[in-house]
UniProtKB/Swiss-Prot annotation:
Its EC number is 3.1.26.5. Gene3D superfamilies: 3.30.230.10. One of its GO terms (molecular function) is ribonuclease P activity. This is Ribonuclease P protein component. It comes from Desulfovibrio desulfuricans (strain ATCC 27774 / DSM 6949 / MB). Pfam families: Ribonuclease_P. Belongs to the RnpA family. The gene is rnpA. It is an enzyme of class 3 (hydrolase). One of its GO terms (biological process) is tRNA 5'-leader removal. Consists of a catalytic RNA component (M1 or rnpB) and a protein subunit.
Length: 130
């Protein structure tokens, strides 16, 4: 059986990498998420993603659901992510209270991908989109 996971090499896992995105990355806001984007120095590498969902969002069930929705979004749209960038998505406090589903997450983050593509050099498939 084939597993459809976001590969480990496309995830940000170390605290130092998260901190670098927070401190030096460009910020983008949506209603439920704060996204930090940091261009990477090594050319030719794929975009990596990381998620941070604090306990302020809700209990473990709620936090895990938000993380699953974010992972699924980035897994399905990884070809459209800006290349050579680290992307950290932080769930805002009220993200757990909202009735988030995949369609709502995609509706919030897809326009953000287009904005990122305009600001980062070497962006991928979204370059030509309005």
């Amino acid at each position: 059986m084939r597993r459809y996971l976001l590969p480990r090499q496309l995830r940000i896992r170390r605290r130092v990498e998260f901190t670098a995105c927070y401190e030096r990355g460009r910020r983008y806001h949506t209603e439920h998420f704060l996204v930090f984007v940091l261009p990477r120095a090594c050319p030719g590498l794929r975009a990596r993603t990381g998620m941070a969902v604090s306990r302020k969002v809700g209990k473990a069930v709620v936090r895990n659901r938000v993380k699953r929705l974010l992972r699924e979004f980035y897994r399905l749209h990884r070809e459209e992510l800006p290349v050579e960038a680290d992307i950290v998505t932080v769930a805002k406090k009220h993200a757990g209270e909202a009735a988030l589903d995949y369609a709502r997450v995609a509706a919030e983050l897809l326009p953000l991908l287009r904005r990122m593509a305009r600001h980062l050099p070497g962006s991928s498939a979204l370059d030509g989109l309005p």
